[in-house]
Amino acid sequence: LAVVFTTLAPLTNGAQWWVRGWDFPRLHIACVAVIAAILGFMLINTWTQIVAVLMICCALYQAVRIFPYSPMAKTELALTPDAPAEERVSLLSINVLMENTEHEKLRQLIDREDPDVLFLMETDAVWASALEEQLARYETVVLHPLVNHYGIIFATRLPARQAETVFLSDDETPTVLAELEGPSGAFFFVGLHPRPPVPGNDTEARDAQIKRAALLADRTYLPVVAMGDFNDVAWSWTAERFKEYGGFRDPRVGRGMLPSFDANSWLMRFPIDQLYLTEGLDLVSFDRLEHIGSDHFPMKAVIAVSPGE
């Protein structure tokens, strides 16, 4: 019954945290359903076999939902590894975990990767102070430190026509909007970190923030890259609407889940640190980097503005 409930609950599209939270462990639910189905068929009686059939249905449904994020599916965003080096833009997105005290690991990572665009989440004044040397290298820095796990640091060496934090929902979680001039053309950057579906946090504000960001992307004349800890898995209903409203493409489709959270657990990991691109942007690479003491892995992307954009 638990497998059936956790499979059916997200179909209601309810905003309650105990509904939306079941979007996350679809792979885990499918595995439990398969095991339950096998056990049900081994016990020869009508009731257990009915349960086994229900488990197979649940497993198949969950598999259909997550299949696009397997290497067997067709990709929706081709890689362009031959993009000229001088036209590439590197982006680094990291939820640092506000309580994480391993500042030196992040400093070394930033020094090594030297991204053109740096987007850090869960940053407070302590983190801002710890990264002063690294941030001083960037032409544009937007600091919005907070002590509620939703502080943001945005930094870029690209010419910025606009770079600011805005509030797209009423839950005091800022979003970064930036219009940047890349080597081969301009593009728009959206950095998101909405609240997760946990006890005390239903998802109305998260879903509204994600939807409004997508609509902003749809209205700009520039190609758009959206990046950050969405606190939402790639296969959720909200993520699908985000892609539809903004015309986004997901590099995970057809390549694998590339789970980014929880970095401290080998079993319960989910792809919630996202990268989305609209037409007009080419993807050179998208990678998960090493553990830096946070509960999220750093995510790095290299993009280029498509020729003619």
Outline where the language-model segments fall:
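Intrinsically disordered, low-complexity boundary segments flanking structured domains
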Residues: 8-9, 77-81, 129, 237
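Glycine/proline-rich, flexible active-site/cofactor-binding loop segments
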Residues: 33-68, 173-193
